[in-house]
Amino acid sequence: KWEGVKASQYLEYEKSGSRDIMEIPNNRNSTAFGRLLMAELAEGKGRFLTDIMDGVFYFCEQTTWAESAHLVAFQKSKRSIPDYRTDVLELRQDGLAQMLSWTYYFLHDQLDKIDPIISMRLRHELQKRELDPFINRTDFWWMAWKESPTVFVNNWNPWCNANALLCYMLLENDRDKLAKAVYKSMVSVDRYLNYVKADGACEEGATYWGHAFGKLFDYLSELQMITGGKVSLFNNKLVKDMGEFVAKSYIGNGYAVNFADASAHVSNYMALVYRCGKALGSREMMDMAVDCFKERPEAVTSVWLDTYKQIEAMKVLKEMSQAKGDYKADAFTWYPQTEFCYMRNAEAFFAGKGGYNDESHNHNDIGSFVLYYNNTPIMIDAGVGTYTRQTFSSERYTIWTMQGNYHNIPMINGVPE
């Protein structure tokens, strides 16, 4: 059953600030579709084809694939209800476009046997919603098209570029148009690499690494493929340092350093960490991934709107299950530009943060720290609650989880930081 999203559910973002009211049914639809697609690709008997066809038709009939919170930012109307006149490139739109591009690539012949209009319509929507806006527009902030010393770039850049490039690789048969898209993505991602601090830390937090470096890794893998290996950055020191950040931020027992909006629990991307470790020649990353995988085998099964990651994960599952992980982290790690410091011994782990507020997903504090003993949290950062309209607005620092006095900074005579 494909769940419709009502106009009132989009508008609820403006009314109460809720994102979940439209995101939850949307995510249930895309999750179900992703499972149907993977099941059909695995079995290949056409058993799931009717449901896939219904899903394709449903998505094509949607006015937008974007989320209400992002429509406000990108639409000229600045409203959260979809405007049929505007195609928006944002995280969910690009992710769904990637999944539907795989659907067209693998299944358009089978869908044509039912009715050619299904795959014809899908190809039209992918061109209109993803390929054309990517190549024709430069006004999306995440592209960082107008480079300057103060340009802000975060995980959106590699995330959206990786999905867009993959869509072009799967759909575009004109070599000149494909080359133009490849070059444009390279210029944009180069701005992201210029923005990242020289120490390679992810200022957005360890679990956001999967969206930041994780998508950068996907992008660089795609770029290496489409250029026949002529463009490869896997021997670049900054890229390796960015990759190893996730391993150095791992505490143990499923916990990771959770500064900024990151979670305190390692995310479901251990196959990604393992693949990155192999590409970068990092034994530390591979061992960390294997140890986490054996502790929590489910850590590779759920990837939001990312068919590419799921396919690549399945290629290494057997290898990971047979590998012997022996993760040993450094006793001391210091990121001088990002101002993260990690110290550990046999029993204790301490992480301290300096930095400043004008960082992606940052909180309003003079600094923060977490302390673990025998992989058990003792002094914690409460993290972040459910994202709402307030989370990424001028009201952000009115939310208690974003304030220093609810981290571990004391109040002096009743005066907060």
Model-predicted segments: where are they?
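Active-site lining segments of carbohydrate-active enzymes
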Residues: 79-207, 218, 309-312, 317-326
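Structural helix-adjacent loops and short alpha-helical linkers that scaffold large soluble proteins
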Residues: 40-53, 103-127, 168-186, 223-239, ...
